Amino acid sequence: MCGIVGAIRAHHNVVDFLTDGLKRLEYRGYDSSGIAVNTDGKIKRVRRVGRVQLMEDAAREKGISGGIGIGHTRWATHGGVTEPNAHPHISGGMIAVVHNGIIENFESERKRLEGLGYRFESQTDTEVIAHSINHEYAQNGGRLFEAVQEAVKRFHGAYAIAVIAQDKPDELVVARMGCPLLVALGDDETFIASDVSAVIAFTRRVAYLEDGDIALLASDGIKRLTDKNGLPAERKVKVSELSLASLELGLYSHFMQKEIHEQPRAIADTAEVFLDGGFIPENFGKDAKSVFESIRSVKILACGTSYYAALTAKYWLESIAKIPSDVEIASEYRYRSVIADSDQLVITISQSGETLDTMEALKYAKSLGHRHSLSICNVMESALPRESSLVLYTRAGAEIGVASTKAFTTQLVALFGLAVTLAKVRGLVSEEDEARYTEELRQLPGSVQHALNLEPQIAAWAQQFAKKTSALFLGRGIHYPIALEGALKLKEITYIHAEAYPAGELKHGPLALVDENMPVVVIAPNDSLLDKVKANMQEVGARGGELFVFADLDSNFNATEGVHVIRAPRHVGKLSPVVHTIPVQLLAYHTALARGTDVDKPRNLAKSVTVE
């Protein structure tokens, strides 16, 4: 949520970078944007509610230019969606600040600063930061780095901050605690951003800041950096693997459409570690073998779509590896009394690796005595891998659409690989079993491509869904989490109310909702629960409900009045949930198209949830 950019450029106008960078961060979610630039010794600011383009147009009209500046896309947390609440915030014409995160003690800090004579023009917690730094700056004789050092000592909460001063045209100071922030190095120019997508068009050399870091930047790089203990530190500069092409639409109309169709390649790339090297613990880290041999159970913590991936993994972990597994929503886990088990593996799942609730849940688990942790995420050098003892990166590539697609299916691949690896370590996988699992994984991208070929039929269904106000999704066993994911996708981007239930729970309440106006989507592959699912479908049909069935070629379903059937490719084995994810993604996408909603930037939602 929110996006930060900033730059010091020795030979170029920063406005070009600031506006381009903010546009590349639009996918994170926002409601307003702004930039502040030091122009001839004065800080000039432009802010607008709405799209970044509106703000950029205003900046061009005002002729703003300069060699140092900061920018921000805001997602409202404190105060409404208004221009005065948009960032950057300026204190006394001297200090300009952009901020991602939440300052939990901002009310007491605001009262303190008001007592010192500072006037507030907004309802935000960020203005507290600007005035606090300005106060310290005045007290210490104009040393910006030290002013930020002193000010952040007073803040409780999570933040990523970038600061410029009117009389320091060659200094940009940044600080990080709990929210992502990176420094990128070019030729006589230095950039900062919330994620690498904002800078990749300008440089690929990136250093990721860690919690507690404060850095002083100039056009020729990092001049000073201290860690959480206030000690001098260095951060390794790496070359980003992200390609600029992955951030462009190409021939597609929307990023979600592009990312749905990229899944065969993303799945193949993620599976490669298991197909080339086998299901070995070393795929997860050098200490994984001893950890996997010692654990007695698994706890998975995640939010949103990643939580549904975790629910799917529970079936694999218990059926393949025979290891007791528990799944919890991270935002619930971190606030309850937990019975800790030092021999339990804590797994966290996050596309960004920066989801705040998941990060804090992991820290909580470790504080209780959990010794072993594994993160599965899509972003190199993000917070969760750094906090975890083991890690496996998915290879989904950049995911721009707010509604997750390829990140979800690659998480499933990684979790399946984990289940087989644990089973192998525990002596539960024969050579024949491993060969079978390997072949299932090898064939998966092809099966997913066959499912994508069903798009015209699914698009036709979407025309009917577009007229509805509610929908019900049903699944059984390992396909129940896919029903949950389908309902989430539909509500996220079409704004149609959708719920998902285990099909066996119909008679315990949801059946009361069924009538001729309620479409009921059923995930119905040919597995051991198929007859049970058919019985549940009869219950829906008897109440006049209209059934939309995603079956497979062996399910023996026929379309009749009130029953629509699309047959996905039959994928024998444990990975059927991955294949059946594709149709529910396409259904949501084409229904959103038919309803005319903003597919890639649905209302009220953000891609990276870095606040509570």
From Swiss-Prot:
Start and end residues of each SIS domain: 288-428, 461-602
UniProt cross-references to CDD domains, sorted A to Z: GFAT (cd00714), SIS_GlmS_GlmD_1 (cd05008), SIS_GlmS_GlmD_2 (cd05009)
Residue intervals of the Glutamine amidotransferase type-2 domain: 2-220
Molecular-function annotations in GO: carbohydrate derivative binding; glutamine-fructose-6-phosphate transaminase (isomerizing) activity
Catalytic activity: D-fructose 6-phosphate + L-glutamine = D-glucosamine 6-phosphate + L-glutamate
Annotated Pfam families: GATase_6, SIS
Compartment(s) of residence: Cytoplasm
SUPFAM superfamilies: N-terminal nucleophile aminohydrolases (Ntn hydrolases), SIS domain
Main location: cytoplasm
Catalytic site: C2, K607
Highest taxon of source: Bacteria
Gene Ontology BP term (one): carbohydrate metabolic process
EC number: 2.6.1.16
Keyword DNA-binding tagged: no
Keyword entries, A-Z: Aminotransferase, Cytoplasm, Glutamine amidotransferase, Repeat, Transferase
Gene Ontology annotations for the cellular component aspect, listed alphabetically: cytosol
Top enzyme category: transferase
Assembly and oligomerization: Homodimer.
Function per UniProt: Catalyzes the first step in hexosamine metabolism, converting fructose-6P into glucosamine-6P using glutamine as a nitrogen source.
Protein name: Glutamine--fructose-6-phosphate aminotransferase [isomerizing]
Organism of derivation: Neisseria meningitidis serogroup B (strain ATCC BAA-335 / MC58)
Lineage, top ranks: Bacteria, Pseudomonadati, Pseudomonadota, Betaproteobacteria, Neisseriales
